[in-house]
């Protein structure tokens, strides 16, 4: 095991900082990757798709066919094939997706017109030349909802044995909806994702092919995608992979052929309104990447901001975790009110901005860094987003906050007025990585809603995001402040190297953290992952009384929450003396008593704010020389100044 760890660590180090002797090899590999070719193969390539599809914008219809070459890489025979038909989750209000969406307080979709819903209908399917169209059926492995049609099972004439392969031919039609879950159309803007019948993942215990849920995303195997898309002539198109061929057809259409190896999904977009920009990422120790931006014309002045944020991601994630291997990436600026912003797919992602995007505010930078970062956490490390979404969303939220802090601090609070159209930047309120970057406020609200070890698809729909994104970012940042960034960085890069183009599970990460840190951190993961208990430490009481020539001081600290973490207690005296106590945090309370020639002034639990998961930092300190009056005066004056500025600004518009 130790030799394996050393080998993995060495490989991770090599991935982050390759030697100059490998320059020629990197150059050759980079040229191939820019054509969508990955040599040698990076993944098992056991689910390969050749797809042909045509979009009719007038009817919002996609007509498609696909050939899937699938190989059974498990040790169990496959008696059936199971497919995701995601768009049936938006077919009506009775699907599991829509039922859960209603629970989360989403839009009232009953007001949608009939043509604003979606569907995907498989019209024919053959397996190894045998017509299986009449045998297909919908199954509901998660909730037995008889109205859900998002998983299709096709029984096989003969099981596919371990190591065996099969060719599957599928034909289907689909109706493009008014946007659901960042997929769909508005006007002539189309963003098309999860749009084809896609195989689930066969594992040793059977098919992992969950129904489509409102609070979860996706899971699939890696392979080669060769996709030909026919759209109206003159409409720019962006997609996963590299465009290998473009052919003008009769009837005013153009067919674009895109190709990419070693990815687990394929998404695309087209619109006559896109402005196309290109740029390049270069780095002395990382492979170059061609960047292509599909931009709304009203955002033309923000092109470089999108490119710069993408460069930030490729640089810092590449240095911290491992190189981005594909030689290209497509950035999509979605149409106004499309609802398609902030989503990730292999080698392509959607960002999101506004016409008025002032400097000092991370719009579009924040969402661009986050979605580009998903190329690493989700794209290359392919965790199961149905069950363990925190392994990409949480890792990526932590990484986003760290990368943004490297480049874009200070960034400021901004509020929007007049329906979100006019921004107002409060340049005396800088946002911090530790709180706003890690989304502490959202976690506080939902901290007890679910244990993180609960499969993601079983989280309560309206609170799952706080557990998936926010809690993970906070406990990772806590580990950084506690163990040190060098240790956590080695753990994350080792995990990345060990599990890229594979499907890790939560314990795989915990094992690597223990190995790299040299500690058994099971107690920590038991609390942050397997429990919904919360952390909350504070100072309950602080006293100082004169006793002759001395002062007798007492400090009572308390664990208000159920979760346990070691914390420091800083006690400060009027003489300037500072005493730091190290408390294991296990007892409900602890008393510290002192005899000193000067009185105690204040006490503070966790003065360096290591425990970012602490729900209530306002109770962490007490002072015997309160500054409440001056604080109230300061805040009152500040708010009055803001109010005056706002009134003057609005008056100027009158």
Language-model region placement:
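Short acidic/polar inter-strand loop motif in beta-rich domains
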Residues: 90, 174-181, 607-619
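Bacterial N-terminal signal peptides
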Residues: 6-14
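Ligand-binding face of N-terminal immunoglobulin V-set domains in extracellular IgSF glycoproteins
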Residues: 61-89, 93-95, 105-106
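Solvent-exposed beta-strand/loop surfaces of large extracellular or lumenal domains
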Residues: 34-42, 91-155, 179-183, 242-251, ...
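N-terminal, polar/Ser/Thr-rich
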Residues: 20-63, 186, 521-523, 527-528
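Beta-strand-rich binding/interaction modules
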Residues: 238-239, 522, 535-538, 542-608
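Extended, low-hydrophobicity, Ser/Thr/Pro/Gly-biased non-transmembrane segments
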Residues: 104-124, 128, 150-157, 167-274
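Hydrophobic alpha-helical and helix-loop surface patches within well-folded domains
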Residues: 46, 85, 89, 258, ...
């Amino acid at each position: 095991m130790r030799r394996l760890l050393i080998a993995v660590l060495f490989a991770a180090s090599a991935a982050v900082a390759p030697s100059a002797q490998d320059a020629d090899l990197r150059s050759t590999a980079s040229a191939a990757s820019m054509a969508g070719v990955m040599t040698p193969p990076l993944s098992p390539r056991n689910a390969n798709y050749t797809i042909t599809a045509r979009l009719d914008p007038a009817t919002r219809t996609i007509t498609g066919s696909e050939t899937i070459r699938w190989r059974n890489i498990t040790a169990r025979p496959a008696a059936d094939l199971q497919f995701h038909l995601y768009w049936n989750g938006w077919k009506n209000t009775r699907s599991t997706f829509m039922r859960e969406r209603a629970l989360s307080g989403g839009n009232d979709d009953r007001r949608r017109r009939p043509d604003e819903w979606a569907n995907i209908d498989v019209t024919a399917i053959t397996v190894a030349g045998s017509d299986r169209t009449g045998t297909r059926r919908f199954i509901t492995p998660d909730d037995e909802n008889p109205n859900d049609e998002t998983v299709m099972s096709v029984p096989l004439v003969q099981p596919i044995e371990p190591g065996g392969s099969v060719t599957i031919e599928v034909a289907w039609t689909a109706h493009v909806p008014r946007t659901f879950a960042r997929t769909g159309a508005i006007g002539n803007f189309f963003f098309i994702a999860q749009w084809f019948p896609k195989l689930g993942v066969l594992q040793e215990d059977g098919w992992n092919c969950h129904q489509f849920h409102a609070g979860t995303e996706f899971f699939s195997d890696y392979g080669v995608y060769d996709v030909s898309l026919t759209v109206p002539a003159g409409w720019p198109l962006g997609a996963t992979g590299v465009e290998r061929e473009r052919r003008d057809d009769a009837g005013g259409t153009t067919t674009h052929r895109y190709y990419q190896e070693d990815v687990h999904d394929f998404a695309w977009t087209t619109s006559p309104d896109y402005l196309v920009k290109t740029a390049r990422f270069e780095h002395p120790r990382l492979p170059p990447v061609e960047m292509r931006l599909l931009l709304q014309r009203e955002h033309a002045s923000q092109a470089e901001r999108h490119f710069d944020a993408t460069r930030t991601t490729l640089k810092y994630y590449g240095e911290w975790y491992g190189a981005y291997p594909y030689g290209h990436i497509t950035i999509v600026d979605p149409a106004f009110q499309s609802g398609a912003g902030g989503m990730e797919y292999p080698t392509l992602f959607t960002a999101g901005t506004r016409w008025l995007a002032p400097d000092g505010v991370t719009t579009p930078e924040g969402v661009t860094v986050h979605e580009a970062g998903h190329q690493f956490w989700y794209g290359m490390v392919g965790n199961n987003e149905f069950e363990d979404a925190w392994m990409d969303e949480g890792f990526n939220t932590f990484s986003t906050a760290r990368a943004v802090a490297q480049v874009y601090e200070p960034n400021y609070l901004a509020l929007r007025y007049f329906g979100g159209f006019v921004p107002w930047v409060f340049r005396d309120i800088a946002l911090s990585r530790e709180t706003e970057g890690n989304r502490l406020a959202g976690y506080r609200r939902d901290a007890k809603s679910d244990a993180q070890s609960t499969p993601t698809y079983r989280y309560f729909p309206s609170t799952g995001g706080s557990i998936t994104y926010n809690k993970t970012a906070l406990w990772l940042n806590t580990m950084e402040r506690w163990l040190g960034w060098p240790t956590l960085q080695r753990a994350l890069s080792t995990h990345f190297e060990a599990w890229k183009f594979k499907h890790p599970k939560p314990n795989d990460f915990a094992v690597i953290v223990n190995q790299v840190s040299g500690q058994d951190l099971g107690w920590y993961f038991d609390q942050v992952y397997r429990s919904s208990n919360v952390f909350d430490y504070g100072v309950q009481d602080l006293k100082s009384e004169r006793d002759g020539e001395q002062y007798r001081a007492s400090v009572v600290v308390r664990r208000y929450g159920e979760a346990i973490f070691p914390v420091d207690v800083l006690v400060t005296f009027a003489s300037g003396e500072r005493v730091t106590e190290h408390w294991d945090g296990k007892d409900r309370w602890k008393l510290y008593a002192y005899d000193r020639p000067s009185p105690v002034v204040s006490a503070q639990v966790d003065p360096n704010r290591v425990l970012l998961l602490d729900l209530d930092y306002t109770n962490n300190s007490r002072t015997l020389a309160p500054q409440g009056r001056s604080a109230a005066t300061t805040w009152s004056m500040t708010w009055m100044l803001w109010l005056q500025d706002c009134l003057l600004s609005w008056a100027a518009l009158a």
